[in-house]
Protein backbone atom coordinates (compact mmCIF):
# COMPACT_ATOMS: atom_id res chain seq x y z
CA UNK A 1 0.00 0.00 0.00
CA UNK A 2 1.41 3.40 -0.91
CA UNK A 3 1.93 6.25 1.55
CA UNK A 4 -1.09 8.28 0.43
CA UNK A 5 -3.43 5.30 0.88
CA UNK A 6 -2.05 4.71 4.40
CA UNK A 7 -2.53 8.38 5.33
CA UNK A 8 -6.05 8.30 3.90
CA UNK A 9 -6.97 5.23 5.98
CA UNK A 10 -5.63 6.93 9.14
CA UNK A 11 -7.64 10.06 8.33
CA UNK A 12 -10.81 7.97 7.80
CA UNK A 13 -10.25 6.30 11.18
CA UNK A 14 -9.77 9.69 12.84
CA UNK A 15 -12.87 11.13 11.13
CA UNK A 16 -15.05 8.21 12.20
CA UNK A 17 -13.90 8.14 15.81
CA UNK A 18 -16.68 6.34 17.70
CA UNK A 19 -19.18 6.47 14.82
CA UNK A 20 -20.01 3.50 12.63
CA UNK A 21 -21.37 3.88 9.13
CA UNK A 22 -23.85 1.14 8.16
CA UNK A 23 -23.77 -0.68 4.84
CA UNK A 24 -26.20 1.01 2.46
CA UNK A 25 -26.63 1.11 -1.29
CA UNK A 26 -28.55 3.09 -3.91
CA UNK A 27 -32.28 2.50 -3.53
CA UNK A 28 -32.12 2.33 0.27
CA UNK A 29 -34.17 4.77 2.34
CA UNK A 30 -31.93 6.35 4.96
CA UNK A 31 -32.27 8.86 7.79
CA UNK A 32 -29.17 11.07 7.93
CA UNK A 33 -28.75 13.09 11.14
CA UNK A 34 -26.75 16.25 10.46
CA UNK A 35 -25.23 18.59 13.05
CA UNK A 36 -26.41 22.13 12.19
CA UNK A 37 -24.84 25.20 13.80
CA UNK A 38 -27.10 28.26 13.97
CA UNK A 39 -25.22 31.10 15.63
CA UNK A 40 -24.23 29.71 19.01
CA UNK A 41 -26.80 26.90 19.03
CA UNK A 42 -26.00 23.43 17.75
CA UNK A 43 -28.80 21.04 16.88
CA UNK A 44 -29.30 17.79 14.98
CA UNK A 45 -31.42 17.86 11.83
CA UNK A 46 -32.82 14.62 10.36
CA UNK A 47 -32.89 14.27 6.57
CA UNK A 48 -34.82 11.24 5.30
CA UNK A 49 -34.83 10.12 1.68
CA UNK A 50 -33.72 7.62 -0.95
CA UNK A 51 -30.05 7.18 -1.77
CA UNK A 52 -29.83 7.80 -5.53
CA UNK A 53 -26.04 7.67 -5.88
CA UNK A 54 -23.03 6.55 -3.89
CA UNK A 55 -19.47 7.58 -4.71
CA UNK A 56 -16.73 5.45 -3.14
CA UNK A 57 -13.46 7.41 -3.23
CA UNK A 58 -11.82 6.68 0.12
CA UNK A 59 -11.82 9.82 2.25
CA UNK A 60 -13.66 11.71 -0.51
CA UNK A 61 -16.61 9.28 -0.53
CA UNK A 62 -20.05 10.81 -0.77
CA UNK A 63 -23.68 9.93 -1.40
CA UNK A 64 -26.75 11.76 -2.67
CA UNK A 65 -30.09 11.52 -0.86
CA UNK A 66 -33.32 12.58 -2.58
CA UNK A 67 -36.57 13.38 -0.82
CA UNK A 68 -39.85 15.01 -1.77
CA UNK A 69 -40.46 18.08 0.38
CA UNK A 70 -43.91 19.71 -0.02
CA UNK A 71 -44.27 18.35 -3.56
CA UNK A 72 -40.80 19.45 -4.69
CA UNK A 73 -37.85 17.09 -5.13
CA UNK A 74 -34.85 18.00 -2.99
CA UNK A 75 -31.43 16.36 -3.31
CA UNK A 76 -28.59 16.74 -0.88
CA UNK A 77 -25.03 15.47 -1.16
CA UNK A 78 -23.33 14.25 2.00
CA UNK A 79 -19.64 13.50 2.51
CA UNK A 80 -19.54 10.02 4.05
CA UNK A 81 -16.76 10.79 6.55
CA UNK A 82 -17.83 14.36 7.37
CA UNK A 83 -17.69 15.40 11.04
CA UNK A 84 -21.07 17.12 10.49
CA UNK A 85 -22.83 13.75 10.13
CA UNK A 86 -24.15 12.61 13.51
CA UNK A 87 -25.53 9.26 12.31
CA UNK A 88 -26.91 7.31 9.36
CA UNK A 89 -29.80 4.88 9.87
CA UNK A 90 -31.02 2.54 7.12
CA UNK A 91 -34.81 2.53 7.33
CA UNK A 92 -35.62 0.35 4.32
CA UNK A 93 -33.62 -1.65 1.76
CA UNK A 94 -34.46 -1.02 -1.89
CA UNK A 95 -34.26 -3.59 -4.68
CA UNK A 96 -32.73 -1.83 -7.69
CA UNK A 97 -30.55 -2.91 -10.61
CA UNK A 98 -28.65 0.33 -11.15
CA UNK A 99 -25.79 2.04 -9.32
CA UNK A 100 -27.07 5.55 -10.08
CA UNK A 101 -30.80 6.24 -9.85
CA UNK A 102 -30.82 9.60 -11.61
CA UNK A 103 -33.89 8.53 -13.59
CA UNK A 104 -35.95 9.11 -10.41
CA UNK A 105 -35.52 12.86 -11.00
CA UNK A 106 -37.89 12.67 -13.96
CA UNK A 107 -40.48 10.55 -12.16
CA UNK A 108 -43.08 11.40 -9.56
CA UNK A 109 -45.80 9.57 -7.69
CA UNK A 110 -46.19 5.83 -8.08
CA UNK A 111 -43.62 5.52 -10.87
CA UNK A 112 -40.91 6.79 -8.49
CA UNK A 113 -41.51 3.98 -6.00
CA UNK A 114 -38.76 1.47 -5.30
CA UNK A 115 -39.46 -2.18 -4.55
CA UNK A 116 -38.33 -3.39 -1.12
CA UNK A 117 -35.55 -5.96 -1.02
CA UNK A 118 -36.72 -9.12 0.71
CA UNK A 119 -34.13 -10.91 2.85
CA UNK A 120 -34.09 -14.72 2.99
CA UNK A 121 -34.88 -16.36 6.35
CA UNK A 122 -31.38 -17.84 6.79
CA UNK A 123 -29.82 -14.41 6.10
CA UNK A 124 -32.25 -12.72 8.50
CA UNK A 125 -31.24 -14.99 11.42
CA UNK A 126 -27.49 -14.36 11.05
CA UNK A 127 -27.36 -10.60 11.92
CA UNK A 128 -29.39 -11.11 15.13
CA UNK A 129 -26.94 -13.68 16.55
UniProtKB/Swiss-Prot annotation:
The keyword Kinase does not apply. GO terms for biological process: translation. The keyword Ribonucleoprotein applies. GO terms for cellular component: cytosolic large ribosomal subunit. InterPro entries: Ribosomal_bL19, Ribosomal_bL19_CS, Ribosomal_bL19_sf, Translation_prot_SH3-like_sf. SUPFAM superfamilies: Translation proteins SH3-like domain (SSF50104). It comes from the Bacteria. Keywords: Ribonucleoprotein, Ribosomal protein. Belongs to the bacterial ribosomal protein bL19 family. This protein is located at the 30S-50S ribosomal subunit interface and may play a role in the structure and function of the aminoacyl-tRNA binding site. This is Large ribosomal subunit protein bL19. The gene is rplS.
Amino acid sequence: MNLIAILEQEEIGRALGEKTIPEFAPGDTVIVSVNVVEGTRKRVQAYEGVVIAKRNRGLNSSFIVRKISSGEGVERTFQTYSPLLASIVVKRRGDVRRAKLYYLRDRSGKSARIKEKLVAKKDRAAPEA
